[in-house]
Amino acid sequence: MRSKYAVKPHIKPVYDMLTLLLRPYLWLKYRFRAPKDIPALPDGPIVLLGSHTGNLDFLFALATLRQKRFHAVVAAHFYRNHRIGWLLNLFRCIKKEQFRADVESIARMKNTIEMGESLLIYPEGEVNGTGRTAPFSDSIAKLAKLLKAPLYAVRTHGGYFTRPKWNPVQRRGKVETEFELIATAEEVKSLSMNELYERIEQKLFVDDYAWQKRRMIPFGGKNRAKGLENLLYLCPKCGGELTTRTDGNDIYCAACGNRGTVDEYGFLHPVGEGSVIPEMVPDWVELERDALRREIAKDDFALIAPCHIQYHLDPNTTAHTDVGRGTATLTHTELIYEGTAEGKPIRYAFPLEGIYKFPFNMGNQFDVPNTIRTISIRPENKQINEKFVLALPLIHEYINTKNA
């Protein structure tokens, strides 16, 4: 009897033709070349883990390693559009809910390995917006031990500059990948959970700004700063929040006049005497995290914002629909929405235990992983959206440190 978690094998001619065409397409579009120093692979299935700094990372991964046929683990968000969902099913992708336990997807991953086909997984769970690998859950080590397959890493460089999450408009430069063994099947079994997790962290780490310092490849285009205000909401000079604005290639503070510009290589530079601008986006984000840590350390911490609540109602799009208005409050223990939904008063309280991060659309809304229905919060001030997203992992960090 066929298991309800069974995964269909790839349609080999379709998969092979797709990956064959990928390399010339990616060269023409993004100047991508697959590395030549790919080590020999073992017979049977492997688990390929990828860094996730750009929206197209999976294409570069598939083009890098044509020796295996991969089932990509894809966020359930994309399946909410029926047409995209049909395409993902055609390519035998595995649907997974983001940042919460999903027993069904784990069963499908295990079934894939057992039938002899390989997996492509991005442990970060979503594209990070900084070009530097974001922390991810240690559950990936537990999953690797469950799957019992050789573990490899594919690191993508340049994908962040090509299509940054804060302004996903194509900027042609160059994309490169690296491929490396993380652990053999025997090592996956013998290493402790912590040892395996630390090895995964080390092999997956990517810093596109450090790579760019070495390569200095221009990623041209107009309005290079557009959208950065939704990520970099805190002024590094005066400490004002939600005061940053962008204009063309410049980012500035509407409160104190602090100003910087983004060059063709993606680096930031101060403009004018006295301006304080970090050279790299992830360093600016670290300033925001440090400020948030100080807020979260207070016993009465609460992040509050007027907002709209959204449900997913249209099966022909991944976008959500406003269905009410109220207030979102994030505390040490829960996210609360209080207001209206579909014309009726409502109160949702989501415990933070079990929610590692909020999936988000930068400058728009963040999703709330839960078992009730697809729910999103769209703050009225779009810049504070990023503060909610950054706060959740830091709350977990604070609680874990406090309880240690």
Q: What role is predicted for each listed range?
A:
Residues 72, 262, 335-339, 368:
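Short hydrophobic/aromatic-rich beta-strand segments that constitute the beta-sheet cores
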Residues 174-234, 241, 373-389:
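A broadly conserved sequence feature marking short terminus-proximal activation segments
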Residues 270-327:
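Anionic N-terminal interaction surfaces
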Residues 358-404:
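Canonical pleckstrin homology
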